[in-house]
Amino acid sequence: MDPIELRSVNIEPYEDSCSVDSIQSCYTGMGNSEKGAMDSQFANEDAESQKFLTNGFLGKKTLTDYADEHHPGTTSFGMSSFNLSNAIMGSGILGLSYAMANTGIVLFVIMLLTVAILSLYSVHLLLKTAKEGGSLIYEKLGEKAFGWPGKIGAFISITMQNIGAMSSYLFIIKYELPEVIRVFMGLEENTGEWYLNGNYLVLFVSVGIILPLSLLKNLGYLGYTSGFSLTCMVFFVSVVIYKKFQIPCPLPVLDHNNGNLTFNNTLPMHVIMLPNNSESTGMNFMVDYTHRDPEGLDEKPAAGPLHGSGVEYEAHSGDKCQPKYFVFNSRTAYAIPILAFAFVCHPEVLPIYSELKDRSRRKMQTVSNISITGMLVMYLLAALFGYLSFYGEVEDELLHAYSKVYTFDTALLMVRLAVLVAVTLTVPIVLFPIRTSVITLLFPRRPFSWVKHFGIAAIIIALNNVLVILVPTIKYIFGFIGASSATMLIFILPAAFYLKLVKKEPLRSPQKIGALVFLVTGIIFMMGSMALIIIDWIYNPPNPDHH
């Protein structure tokens, strides 16, 4: 009997409960590979700290057979809400301002609300399917619905989503670690030395920190970093709101090659400095002194981007500092995938549901409502104030945009350090379920092997590093993963599983019709987004110098 399957068994209290030390003797029918994964993940860890380190392995409490949906869980309502919020929150928040800049405020808010509501409906379908299908494992639901192809489809979608998350975390290291080192060394600009090269740094961090942590058998203690990760994102949003009222508009025209302020001789300019509550730091920039158009001047965009800045600064235009409410361009295609990437939490919904104390579908739906609503508010604040800080000059990774304005800033340095520590410690947690799924799929019922344990981790990390080094910007990760695996996990798979496994509702019932419409909507979103992204790649090929 599968230890995590929902079966109709005797629901008398389970007196001979298996302890962690006797897992192997209690489950002799379980493959050695699976036992090794479970023993390594959950030894000496309580249910609160286990959280959701893997997709499907639910902790030592869940190693007993679940009698039915009302088998008592161990995790409180509040902790479950916190866990799901942390599962939703991720690096996607850093790309939302870029999405708003390429959709406009009104269109972005409509799309954000739409994706949030659809995510809630998707969770509803998933919870109902789990009950009717009799499983709390995403891949197992796929197998029950469509056999081996369904299992592989769910496996590929979850693996791609986790690889996308890993790559986005490594991108943040590549973007932000050089800035942190530059500030600590007191350099005005990135001089191009090897220790300021993001490609080298991400390799060093991967080999020196991430790989050793990924080789540990027990990663349970890293689950506590999820709380730190969520806290640092709250701090990040607070700093974004605060900095909105410090950054002027138009943006400063800075020559990053010479480290000096430059200006157009035809426009009256003057130098000012904004303090950042630090004695030795500040923000220098040039602004139009008169804030009016000099007579006889025909303002045109500056000739090309400033070298090394990654941002094209234009001469002051009338609407440069006016927010746009509706925007359509080639980059608008990235908006829905970025939003989908930001709201994916579905592989973690079932493990969290299984551990919810006195659980019911209604209670878990309430947990989902609270978590997604909370993240919706944070996403909206981060996107809005990040966009209003830079308008059309916002970058696809918001933190990196601030380095174009601030040379040294204590608050931003603290945010960068917090985010770097959080994402570095999160990568092994994301890697662990990928490795477990690969071992289970390729080496079923094989004994634990350190060679496989090390080799698969090294291959996954190496592939992610190659991806991060070769792909010029994080928006391509957000876009491609959001349009493919995120759309599969939010829209297509839950609806398809529901239509196939929930037998008691007729096909023409409102519930089934709604699920069918949801499925078709997901397919349209995926095909449309992928087509537009590919068109953007063709007509606006990636710039290898962008970083």
Swiss-Prot record:
Expression tissues: Expressed predominantly in liver, and at lower level in skeletal muscle.
TM ranges are 105-125, 152-172, 196-216, 221-241, 333-353, 370-390, 412-432, 454-474, 477-497, 515-535
**Annotated site (Influences on amino acid transport capacity), which positions?**
C232
Q: Which InterPro entries does the protein's record reference?
A: AA_transpt_TM (IPR013057)
Which keywords has UniProt assigned to this entry?
Amino-acid transport, Cell membrane, Cell projection, Disulfide bond, Glycoprotein, Ion transport, Membrane, Phosphoprotein, Sodium, Sodium transport, Symport, Transmembrane, Transmembrane helix, Transport
Q: Which reaction does it catalyse?
A: L-alanine(in) + Na(+)(in) = L-alanine(out) + Na(+)(out); L-serine(in) + Na(+)(in) = L-serine(out) + Na(+)(out); glycine(in) + Na(+)(in) = glycine(out) + Na(+)(out); L-cysteine(in) + Na(+)(in) = L-cysteine(out) + Na(+)(out)
Positions carrying Phosphoserine are: S49
Cytoplasmic side, ranges: 126-151, 217-220, 354-369, 433-453, 498-514
Cite the ranges annotated as topological domain Extracellular: 1-104, 173-195, 242-332, 391-411, 475-476, 536-547
This protein's membrane topology, according to the annotation, is:
Multi-pass membrane protein
Listed disulfide bonds for this chain?
Answer: C249-C321
Q: Which GO terms describe its molecular function?
A: active monoatomic ion transmembrane transporter activity; alanine:sodium symporter activity; amino acid transmembrane transporter activity; amino acid:sodium symporter activity; L-amino acid transmembrane transporter activity; L-arginine transmembrane transporter activity; neutral L-amino acid:sodium symporter activity
Please give a single GO biological process term from the UniProt record.
L-alanine transmembrane transport
What does the PTM comment of the record read? The disulfide bond plays an important role in substrate transport, but has no effect on trafficking to the cell surface.
UniProt-annotated glycosylation sites, renumbered to this chain: N260, N264, N276
- Report the subcellular localization: Cell membrane; Cell projection, Microvillus membrane
Task: Give the principal location in a single coarse category.
Answer: membrane
Q: Which GO terms describe its cellular component?
A: microvillus membrane; plasma membrane
Top-level taxon: Eukaryota
Q: In UniProt terms, what function does this protein have? A: Symporter that cotransports neutral amino acids and sodium ions from the extraccellular to the intracellular side of the cell membrane. The transport is electrogenic, pH dependent and partially tolerates substitution of Na(+) by Li(+). Preferentially transports smaller amino acids, such as glycine, L-alanine, L-serine, L-asparagine and L-threonine, followed by L-cysteine, L-histidine, L-proline and L-glutamine and L-methionine.
Q: Which family does it belong to?
A: Belongs to the amino acid/polyamine transporter 2 family.
Q: Give the protein's recorded name.
A: Sodium-coupled neutral amino acid transporter 4
Q: What is the lineage of its organism?
A: Eukaryota, Metazoa, Chordata, Craniata, Vertebrata
